[in-house]
Design a protein with these regions (language model features):
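Pocket-lining segment of extracytoplasmic ligand-binding domains
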Residues: 115-116, 203-293
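Conserved C-terminal helix/tail region of periplasmic/extracytoplasmic solute-binding proteins
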Residues: 329-382
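Short, glycine-/small- and polar/acidic-enriched structural segments
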Residues: 35-40, 45-197, 207, 214-220, ...
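Short linear loop/turn motifs
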Residues: 88-89, 96, 190-194, 301-308, ...
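Secondary-structure end/capping motifs
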Residues: 259-342
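Solvent-exposed, acidic/flexible segments
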Residues: 60, 64, 91, 95, ...
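Predominant activation on well-ordered alpha-helical scaffold segments within soluble catalytic domains
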Residues: 72, 118, 174, 224, ...
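Short, low-complexity disordered leader/linker segments with a strong preference
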Residues: 1-56, 362-382
């Protein structure tokens, strides 16, 4: 078991930045008096781009996580400069620090976490706007090798699931359990499904292998290494809820209102980077390997898949407003954040992404990708 633990530690060291970026820590936000949230877009979608003033954007990145692949590719290929928006990147030490910086204007944009924004907003912070996506549906369910694949919620009844508290997937699953008329709780509470919080993926996976837990919820494509853990990838949270958000693009309210054009240009470059990622695997992996220092095969597994592994994590820049608002309400439903009467709809804005997409469609009317993304946007953003 010592050898096993050492293997896990070595493998997870390379993935830890990704795991940390998946959902975020539970922040302790500084409350402030709620302010009226504007329902009007910060700029007219049809306004000429050249007529708007564009100020630089300061964008936060966490470690060497590659989830914001569109941004990383766009930066490497000079797309931000081509679109006329100066983008300065800053590394942050923690999710809590990042959201505090965005809420106070120290950062304009942050590209990770879905839970942190909701926690800050529920605690009284009114200066955050979720304007786009980074990835979605990233939570996998692992168990000891030989465990049958999960086919339905009935397979989880009477079982114990280990997870990290900030994990998006565990919150989504708990809300689904409630909706189906079942209960969840801590050990000894007599719930239909028991959840145990652990500090990171190592004790969760080890516990499954030892028989201490029946399942564990992990993220950041750790299922790619399941066989090396003595574990098996037996399901996903996406089987129960699809779509649901993971990392989001979040900005400061003042940036949204006063520097809207810069956000649009940022998103255009981001979308161009996303298109490049879809069509140029080897070149994209070169960029990401140079940026992150991660194992190339694991990078491919995360973002493209391999012969033996299909990632559940979906790279998407779409705000997915409907799913995002539903997730924030789910956090209230399960008691993850206090019900303070927040109108979540007002904090998820879609006009930055839609304006960027409209301009790309005007620029490249025959590009099938922009049409595909436009159709998805119309379906998932009420």
């Amino acid at each position: 078991m010592k050898k096993f633990s050492k293997l896990l530690a070595l493998l997870l060291a390379a993935c830890m930045a990704l795991a940390l970026a998946a959902c975020g820590e539970a922040p302790a936000a500084e409350s402030e008096e709620p302010a009226a949230v504007s329902e009007e877009p910060a700029a007219e979608s049809g306004a000429p781009a050249e007529a708007a003033e564009v100020a630089p954007l300061t964008v936060g990145l966490l470690g060497t996580a590659v989830k914001p692949v569109g941004v990383l590719v766009a930066d490497a290929l000079g797309y931000f400069a081509e679109e006329g928006v100066e983008t300065d990147f800053e590394k942050v030490s923690s999710m809590n620090d990042a959201y505090m910086a965005v809420s106070t204007g120290g950062l304009d944009v942050y590209l990770f976490s879905s839970t942190a924004a909701a926690t800050f907003i529920a605690q009284g912070t009114t200066t955050l706007r979720v304007f786009g996506g980074t990835v979605g549906e990233g939570s996998e369910i692992m168990a000891a090798a030989g465990t049958p694949e999960i086919t339905g919620l009935e397979d989880l009844l009477g079982k114990t699931i280990a997870c990290q508290m900030p994990e998006t997937g565990q919150m989504v699953l708990k809300n689904y359990i409630m909706e189906q008329g079942y209960t969840f709780g801590a050990p000894g509470e007599g719930a239909d499904i028991t959840f145990v919080y652990v500090n990171d993926a190592i004790p969760a996976i080890e516990g499954c292998v030892k028989g201490e837990y029946d399942y564990c919820i992990t993220n950041s494509c750790l299922g790619y290494y399941a066989g090396q853990y003595g574990a098996a990838l037996v399901g996903t949270v996406k089987q129960f809820v699809d779509p649901y958000p993971c990392c989001r693009q979040t900005c400061n309210e003042a940036t949204y209102e006063d520097n809207f054009e810069a956000l649009v240009r940022f998103e255009i470059a981001n979308l161009r980077g996303y298109e490049y990622y879809l069509n140029n695997m080897e070149e994209t992996l070169d960029i990401l390997e140079d940026y992150s220092g991660e194992d190339r095969d694991f990078l491919q597994a995360q973002l493209y898949g391999t012969e033996g592994y299909t990632p559940v994590m979906r790279v998407s820049l779409d705000p997915d407003k409907d799913a995002c608002v539903e997730f924030y309400q789910a956090m209230v439903n399960i008691g993850e954040v206090e019900d303070t009467g927040v109108d979540w709809d007002q904090y998820v804005v879609t006009d930055v992404y839609s304006t960027a997409l409209e301009r790309l469609m005007e620029r490249e009317p025959d590009n099938a990708l922009w049409q595909e993304l436009s159709e998805y946007f119309a379906e998932h953003n009420s």
